[in-house]
Amino acid sequence: MKIHVTGATGFLGSELLQLVPGATGERVEVRDEAAVHELFERLRPDVVIHTAYRQDGEGAREIVVEGAENVALAAVAVGARLVHLSTDVVFDGRKGGPYLEADEPSPCTEYGRAKADAEARVGKAAPDALIVRTSLIVGGPGHEPSKHELVARDPAMTFYDDEIRSPVQVGDLAAALLELAALDLSGLLNVAGADDVSRAELAELVGGRPVRRAPAPPGRPLDCSLDSSRARSLLRTQLRGVRSVFA
């Protein structure tokens, strides 16, 4: 099975390449539809795992939305299976409990709106694609730290105690994606860690010390925890919670 990973230099993308030495990760400007098609025609992958994104800054929305659509169209054109990475912040977190795959998106941030729009574009362009919603990605002890872990180690930072997420260890997520790539599965699937924790608790787990806490300001997502029970029923890979990852 020939696998191509977009965003291969990123935290998750590089983990995928380590797990599958034969996978390709050649860089392409995902906003350039012709360039994406040319790359896929040349590589002829069986599976495309689309992890490339930009959270903010110049061109972020175009990379997230148009980029996802271009990747989906190019994957369909060469007959490749598409696994598209999405996020828990397609929700505003005001439901009051873990979100299921059937819950309608309700983003409250620009990034969340872009990712929700990307999901819709991918679903239309590639109806057989698997859209994986995940959460904050961490490395854990013995692994290169994620940006979330680097921030958590700053003693001057204050962390939100009412923004709840379901962080996942990067190796667990990468292994799960590879398993899912081989399954005949489409639509939405939550793939996140087993523990729902606040930003503040995550920082304390990472840093091993108490942190300064504060409520999230208006406009931030609140409890965006994900119910990943369906994924756990399908996977051999264990999606550990961060309390066990940092134990």
What do these predicted ranges mean?
Residues 209-212, 219-247:
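C-terminal amphipathic/interface module of NAD(P)-dependent oxidoreductases
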Residues 30-70, 76:
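NAD(P)H-binding glycine-rich loop region in Rossmannoid oxidoreductase-like domains
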